[in-house]
Each structure stands twice: as structure tokens, then as C-alpha cells.
Amino acid sequence: DRLAIVCRNPEGEWQIINGNQTAMMFVYYIIKNKIALGQLKPSDFLVKTIVTTEAIAEMAKKNNVELRDCYTGFKWIAREIALSEGKQKYIGGGEESFGFLPYDKVRDKDAPASICLICEIAAWAKDQGKTLYDLLMDIYKEYGFSFEHTINVTKPGKSGADEIKQMMADFRGDKAPKTIA
């Protein structure tokens, strides 16, 4: 149900494209393509989850496309689509965990459609003499650079599960941090 992309950078090394970068490429292409075809309408909207890069918000803002932020999970993206049926046109949405939904027919992340879309984007980039890596650099130049680093923490066994349960209770209660260093 998800898509992962790897491409070569100018040094010939393999570059893993993370979920936020993938969503950025999808949104960039959808907007640029609709503009080129004269199909971008004031009623069009995008959806991203609250954990997804704000670079997408910048793309939407600069192109006068409504962007909706929702909770994490595709059920929330599907909810936004349902709330707008017959009133507005959903043109894409996703989250940083590599899920994307490029149209409104399926109400969950759709890897087959995303695979078709990234192939179309790669062909579009190639027609311009560019690679997917080049396209990502173009996005950064136009909308600003963003960087992230994911850290996975594993807490094994029953003691780990108990520790995670306590951490979550603390975050939900009055022990939640007031500042982040």
C-alpha cells in the first residue's frame, strides 16, 4: 500500500527518497501539470497529515491551492474527501509514511496509482533532461530546503511495552514536556 523511491544523485550514489520528499514530488507535479493544462481550479484542494512536511503547505500557498491538515492516517484524508464531495475537487494527499492518494476514487493510500504517478513524473522530468533527484532539487530551490532525520527507538519485551505505556500516559497527562530542548 506504499511506494518507496531510490534514485541516483549527481555523484552516482543511490539516494533514498523519504516519504515527505515523495509527497513533495507528487504535489509539485500535480500542481505544475494542472497549471500547464489550464486545469487548476479554485475549488481544488490537497490534504496532508499534521506530521507531513510543511513544504507542501508552501507549495499550496504559492499556487493558491487550498490545503487541509488532518490527523495522521488515511481515514482522516478520506474524511476530508467525503466532506467535500460535490463541492470541491480533491487533487491529492498523503503523509510522511510513504502513503499517497493521487485521486478520490479509493479512500486509502494507493500504491498502484502512486507507482503510475511516479513513473509519469520520472518521464516528465526526463523530457526536461532531468532526473527525479534533479526534480527534488528544483522543488527545494523554488519552495525552500527542508531536512529531517527519523530516529527509531525500540523497547523490547514486556518491560519495553510497559515503559512505552508509561511514556504515553505521561505525555497524555500532566507530565508532558513544556519545552523541547
Labelled PLM ranges:
Residues 5-15, 33, 37-181:
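Phosphate-binding and adjacent anionic-ligand microenvironments
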Residues 19-29:
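Catalytic or ion-translocation cores adjacent to nucleophile or general acid/base/metal-coordination motifs
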Residues 1-3:
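Oxyanion-binding/catalytic loops of NTP- or PPi-dependent enzymes
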